[in-house]
């Protein structure tokens, strides 16, 4: 049995290239014939005549050899062309009986269930919004959804679901619209029950109509046993302007399969008011974690970032999406997803968007019940007025709290640092408070307070105040208290400013049974 794999189209292309090369060589040989076969003697003497005759004999021998080589080349090209034709004919002959066999197998399943046993689902036609066909029950990927009709605001078709093995189809894109809202994207199809990737959600359509909204992105499909959830689609842009114009929200990420991760949320669409980022999909029961939230859309007012997905039973929470940039106001960051129900760390909060009035950072996600660290708070955005940092998440029964996010830098005022998350009940240290944001012409931001410790553990340190040039310096945050055994957190340092110096943070109390109080923060020297 031969294990050679042939591609007829490549063989045909190679034969054409060889034929072209042969034609070029033949033309060159013909052009060289006249000056090399009949060479005139340089003089009438015997030596010149003999030399001319010798070179002429060489030219004649080359021409004879060239004729033989041309014949061999032509035979080789003919053989290669015939081989390509034979392979193509064999493939065409094999397709018909195989397809007939598949049709016979699929017929009873189509009749009873409206779905084949083997084979991919049909794609929806572009411009129709048709749903993609479902893949074969045993094996086959779902078809992609068709896009909406351009200019109509029609929703995109949903992607088809896969069978036991196969990938879910992607959702179709929503249609644009000049007289209303953009069309929503289609949802992604579910991945194969045993194995396969879930389909992504379709992107929302844009609009140019006054005070209209872009289409929402489609949700990602759900994963199978071992598959991750599909990513959500991007929200459509709203380009018509107006007070009510808003970008489409990003699609939610798909839920992960039993052992799969959640899908990422889609980004919000651009507009005067940016769309909200899609939420990350929840992780499967035994999956690695939830999906990250989508970024908020850009605009005069940035969109809020999507929240991260939860982590199933034992996974990590997904990170919150960053807030969208804005010329006037930035979007707030999304909250981090909660850790797994049993154990798992919380996801980090998303950063606030940059703007004149910057967005606040998202709060960190709480850890799982038994064990895990709380997620860190997101940093506040920077701009004219810096955004506040997000608070850290709470730790599990055994686990430390998450750190607070730093306040954003602002030319007119710095943002406040986020509070550190409290530790779990039994064991763990409190999270550190975030530092206050710096400023040039306004007050510096105050530092965040440190989180409280568990029964055994240390309190979190307070964040330092933000420095400034013209305004008042930020105050340091207080340190977190210990509980039974452990040292209290140190207070944050005060910052200097031309209009005054902030207060120092007070150290947290030490443990009731053992542990020293935290030290107070320092004044600037």
Curated annotation (Swiss-Prot):
Keyword Secreted: yes
Keywords recorded for this protein, A-Z: Host cytoplasm, Secreted, Virulence
Domain of life: Bacteria
Keyword set includes Magnesium: no
Gene disruption: observed consequences: Deletion mutant is attenuated in vitro and in vivo, and shows enhanced MHC class II-restricted antigen presentation during in vivo infection of mice. Also shows a reduced capability to inhibit autophagy and an increased acidification and lysosomal fusion of phagosomes during infection of phagocytic cells.
Subcellular location: Secreted; Cell surface; Host cytoplasm, Host cytosol
Domain PE, chain residue ranges per copy: 1-93
The protein's name in its UniProt record: PE-PGRS family protein PE_PGRS47
Source organism of this protein record: Mycobacterium tuberculosis (strain ATCC 25618 / H37Rv)
